[in-house]
Structures are given as C-alpha cells and as structure tokens.
Regions:
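Flexible C-terminal active-site loop/helix
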Residues: 251-293
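Alpha/beta enzyme core
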Residues: 2-250, 284-293
Length: 293
C-alpha cells in the first residue's frame, strides 16, 4: 500500500466519506481506480469469496489477516478492515490489531457479538456483556501502532437489546478511545437520526446494505444527518455475483462466452492487474520471451 493520506486526516475533512466494500484483489484494484479516498474490507465478502461459506464466524484470524495483506498490497488508499470479534479473548484482540496493522490496514473494526459472530443484517445475533465489550475496545486502542491507525467500534446490541442499549455501549466505546462509532442496523430513519444526534461531533459510520435491515440512504443524506462515513459493503460482491450468474447462464446456454452480458475487455483486465508494469520490468532487465515459430 502506498497511501498518501491517513484515515485520521480523511476523518478531519468536511463531508461524508463513501466507503465501498472490497473483498479480494480484483475488487480492491477496481475500487482503487474509481477515485474513492478509502476502502473497506468486508468480512462477508472476504469469507464468501475465499471460503465459499456464510459469514457466520467460521473464518480464522490467519485467513482474514492474509486477505488484509492481499488487499492492502493492491491499493494506494487507506483500508479499514473487518476484524470481527477479534477472533477470541483480549489477547486475541491485541494480536489481531497488531497483525492487521502489520499487514497494511489503516484501521480495524472490532464488534461486540458473541462467538461465533454473524453478518450484522442477519438473524440470531447476540452480544457479549457490556464490560467485556468495552475491554476489547480498550485493548484495541492500546495495541495499535500509532494514532494514525483508527479503531472502529461496532455494537450489534440494537438487534438483541434495543437502541438504548446500543447507544449506551457506543458511548462507552467512545470513552474507551474508539475513533469511529458503528451502531449496527438501526431499523428506521428516526433511529438513524437518533444515533447521529446522540453523538453529534463524533465520527459515525452508517452501514448501508442493499436489502438489509437499515433504511438505504445515500452518502449525502447520511452526511446531512451527521454521519461521517457511509459504508456500502455489499455493492461490489452483489454486483459481481449478478454479473457472473448472467455470464455463466449465457455460456451454459449458448456454449460461448461472448454475445451475452457485457464482459470487461481482456486488455482492460490486463491493465487493471498490472501487466503493463510487468512488461516494463521485463524490458528494463532484458527479459526476452521465446515464441514458437
């Protein structure tokens, strides 16, 4: 990663920052070319694309930090990465924060669900005791390598215990040193406004999941409410899944890939993945390619 600005500097700017969800090398490179100022590694997308299973607590720390390393190494802007519950107790949280930072992330999200955790817009989520959740945030804050590495503190208590409980936890997370507050899945516009009004002046993140539990709003609308970050974690992988399904259906029926849904031209894909730099390297160091006559 060769970021020219830190997440903390981005948070100090005016306006609401749009964060697209990325989950692998291709999505990361694609989003990085589109002019976004920062990216977010979605746990759902990372687990789905690497393991082919649901985001239900099955991914390990090792699997996730490896994905952070891949994505951070492919982009030029800061990356916030989903750290789930920290993959265990307080010592695990410390290891996770340090590992994500060493892998190139500019920030990490830590949440208060019980293990095994689940995607924040699905059913049957439960949270750990409030004091234990606060302790995880304190450990995360102390474990980061510098203040430029931001801690996103997420609570899922709205679903299990109600909005008042979620706001109380978020307040304590802020007191523990969290840089960004993430109250997961408010279920009405009024609840979103209440979150924003309760923490006026704090850096607030709103999670916009297509088809999720929270009213789906634009970054401008969320910024007007008082949110600092508008996260769209599923847009990329939902679009990719729809495109692949259409392309594979056409291939199955027609017996050929072209002539159906739009495909990215091969040369554009090569450019996206860095082949021009590979060719320049080979020319610089005298690498020759042998072609059959």
């Amino acid at each position: 990663m060769a970021e020219s600005v830190t997440m903390r500097e981005l948070l100090a700017r005016d306006g609401c920052l749009t964060l697209p969800g990325v989950y692998d090398g291709i999505s990361a490179r694609m989003a990085d070319t589109m002019g976004f100022e920062a990216l977010y590694m979605t746990g759902y997308g990372a687990v789905a694309s690497s393991l082919g299973v649901a985001d239900a607590g099955v991914a390990s720390y090792t699997e996730m930090v490896d994905r952070v390393r891949v994505i951070a190494g492919a982009i030029r802007v800061p990356l916030i990465a989903d750290g789930d519950t920290g993959y265990g107790g307080l010592l695990n949280v410390e290891r996770t924060v340090r590992g994500y930072a060493a892998a190139g992330a500019a920030g990490i999200q830590i949440e208060d669900q019980e293990f095994p955790k689940k995607c924040g817009h699905t059913e049957f989520r439960r949270v750990i005791p409030e004091d234990d959740a606060v302790a995880k945030i304190r450990v995360a804050v102390d474990a980061r390598p510098s203040r430029d590495f931001v801690i996103v503190a997420r609570t899922d208590a709205r679903y299990s215990d109600g909005l008042d409980a979620a706001l109380r936890r978020a307040e304590r997370f802020l007191e523990a040193g969290a840089d960004i507050l993430f109250v997961e899945s408010p279920e009405t516009p009024e609840e979103l406004r209440r979150v924003a009004e309760t923490f006026r002046g704090a850096a607030l993140l709103a999670n916009m999941v297509e088809g999720g539990r929270t009213p789906y709003l634009s970054a401008d609308e969320l910024g007007t409410m008082g949110f600092k970050l508008a996260l769209y974690p599923g847009t990329g992988f939902l679009a990719a899944a729809a495109s692949m399904r259409a392309a594979y259906a056409h291939l199955r029926e027609a017996g050929i890939g072209t002539g159906g849904p739009a495909l990215l031209p091969f040369e554009e894909m090569n450019a996206l993945m860095g082949f021009p730099a590979v060719h320049a390297f080979e020319k610089k160091y005298g690498v020759t390619q042998v072609r059959a006559a």
